[in-house]
Amino acid sequence: MLKTIQDKAKHRTRPLWAWLKLLWQRIDEDNMTTLAGNLAYVSLLSLVPLVAVVFALFAAFPMFSDVSIQLRHFIFANFLPATGDVIQRYIEQFVANSNKMTAVGACGLIVTALLLMYSIDSALNTIWRSKRARPKIYSFAVYWMILTLGPLLAGASLAISSYLLSLRWASDLNTVIDNVLRIFPLLLSWISFWLLYSIVPTIRVPNRDAIVGAFVAALLFEAGKKGFALYITMFPSYQLIYGVLAVIPILFVWVYWTWCIVLLGAEITVTLGEYRKLKQAAEQEEDDEP
């Protein structure tokens, strides 16, 4: 009886072990950590231009003025743990200075922000090993749509959350709304990663694979925020070594860690489909054998 249970357990864990080996092989072949480092560098270069473009778009719509403030606090509180206040102060100063630039400088900001979009596109299609290129005009339209519609959708979601907060006076809905608001960052990350893995690759991505990969990435991202904040609080080595400049390495490490999570979710999404194809091919070979 015990031997039978052990055999069943081995039979069930064997596919998982094979999938994990395939995942590790793909991570190694794609140089995932190197790609994450490249994206982290481009992200830091594009961070201020991207934020400047986003909030310039909000400034063009007066009805989003209150939402713009909420979005700013939400981004720095949920996407830059522990040192979000310091980084927010510096970035807001940089953005304020960028508002004084000429039209040529503003175009440079937009180009730099689009450079980040292109780098993300290139990295994800490298992981999917897609050789099919989009037309340049189509790519530019997609990048511009992300720059314009992305912040507006985020602002709309924050407006909804603000509306939910306004309903907390109803005692019957208090617990439900608290639970919804507690998981709201996780849901937002999940949806964002799912859209990223579904839209950016130039080949068709199975929806269920994108959902699973996005969910794992969202969980790791939320856990990473808490773990990184705990590390900065409990082991303040960066502050001791760098002093007031500690915000620079802390920001870079966090951005690098974030891109590792994003690319790992992409690798998981790809590996799910690849493992399924390999399994089907192996079963087909067994059926063809006499």
Swiss-Prot record:
InterPro entries: UPF0761_bac, Virul_fac_BrkB. GO terms for cellular component: plasma membrane. Disulfide bonds: none annotated. The keyword Transmembrane helix applies. Pfam families: Virul_fac_BrkB. It is a multi-pass membrane protein. It is found in: Cell inner membrane. Belongs to the UPF0761 family. This is UPF0761 membrane protein YihY. The gene is yihY.
